[in-house]
Regions:
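N-terminal [4Fe-4S]-dependent radical SAM core
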Residues: 1-30, 39, 43-49, 168, ...
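Residues at the C-termini of beta-strands that transition into short coil/loop
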Residues: 14, 136, 160
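Receiver (REC) domain switch/active-site residues of two-component response regulators
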Residues: 130
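Conserved Radical SAM active-site core
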Residues: 7-14, 25, 43-125
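P-loop/Walker A phosphate-binding loop and immediately adjacent motor/lid segment at beta-alpha junctions
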Residues: 83-95, 102, 142-189
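Short, conserved loop/helix-junction motifs that constitute active-site signature segments
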Residues: 124-127, 150
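Short secondary-structure boundary segments
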Residues: 105-106, 135-137
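Glycine-centered loop/turn positions within well-structured domains
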Residues: 36
Length: 189
């Protein structure tokens, strides 16, 4: 069965209450299909473009409507950029609901901007993203101390500021770390 723009190939159901895929309590949309095949990838089961299952976007939106106590939505996989039309539609929907949007991709921001010259859907998708975690996972650069990413080459890009300033602007991790420290301190007081 061939995929249409009204359905997305997902690796699994939406995963709520994630605390490792961006700040706050998040729901992860696990897309299926990835051509990067990074050595040491934590999700190799999501590489197969015919794996997972096709889900109508309407059903994914209904699942998003039922979410409770979530501060953000993270697109991961697989690589969401291999399903840009579907992910753009869902990101737009999530943004209207007030969610903070993070996207993990093996493409670099610069590659996505090049791809946007041939198909503007990539730029359209970027416009709904708050933070892009870009670049492939590189096993030789693995670093377990990094916030929300696995290897030194990957960046946390503040997409709205990057698009506005027309240069890469990194997400200010210190703001998150200070907020997190304050939350933990209040828990113990």
């Amino acid at each position: 069965m061939e995929q249409t723009k009204n359905e997305i190939r997902l690796a699994s159901d939406l995963q709520s209450d994630s605390i490792v895929d961006g700040p706050g309590l998040r729901t992860v949309i696990w897309t299926q299909g990835c051509g990067h095949k990074c050595k040491g990838c934590q999700n190799p089961q999501t590489w197969d473009f015919n794996g997972g299952g096709l889900v109508p976007l309407k059903l994914v939106k209904e699942a998003i409507d039922e979410l409770e106590c979530q501060t953000g939505i993270t697109f991961s996989g697989g690589d969401p950029m291999f399903q840009p039309y579907q992910c753009t539609e869902l990101a737009k929907y999530c943004k209207k609901k007030g969610y903070n949007i993070w996207v993990y991709t093996g493409f670099t921001y610069e590659q996505l901007m090049e791809m946007s010259k041939k198909d503007k859907i990539y730029l359209d998708f970027l416009k709904y993203i708050d933070v892009l975690v870009d670049g492939p996972f590189i096993l030789k650069e693995r670093n377990l101390s990094l916030l929300f990413r696995g290897s030194n080459n990957q960046r946390l890009i503040d997409v709205p500021k990057t698009l506005k300033e027309n240069k890469i602007v990194l997400f200010d991790e210190s703001i998150y770390l200070e907020e997190d420290k304050l939350k933990r301190k209040k828990t113990y007081i």
